[in-house]
């Protein structure tokens, strides 16, 4: 368990707040840090040692802290757009394994992942992005029911220069895309 996760839980207890803890594994560009001793050239979620270590870490965190909220991966669609379909599905399967391990230790923990909204929509010209919209990957997570929520980061300035340019219904499509 990373030291900063322990520190966050200690600070939350000290100040009486309910923390939202997340375990990320890549840069905002989708470049992961998943290599291991046994597979140093495999920087993907097909790396068996990495999968085992990540699953064990989140399970240990759930056993020790029983968090109310726990998200695995931040802006995970950045991984989708930079990796193969097989590598993406390996992440989804690991997420589901982690979900089961977390729920076994802490049944009430809300477990979810986070996507980057502008990238998901196929926007981001000011960030240099040219990715097509990829809403379908949400269904990869919803298919087996092993996810409690979805989170999104949003930076409209990646596409729009002024607030006035942002469509009034900018966030409305989320409800239709999540059904």
For each of these PLM feature ranges, what is it?
Residues 27-31, 78-81, 113-124, 152-158, ...:
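Active-site clefts of carbohydrate-active enzymes
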Residues 71-74, 92-133, 179:
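Aromatic-lined carbohydrate-recognition surfaces of secreted/lumenal glycan-active proteins
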Residues 55-88, 112-117, 156:
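Active-site groove signature of glycoside hydrolases
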Residues 1, 65-68, 72-74, 115, ...:
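Aromatic- and acid-rich polysaccharide-binding/catalytic face
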Residues 41-44, 127:
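Short, compositionally biased strand/turn segments
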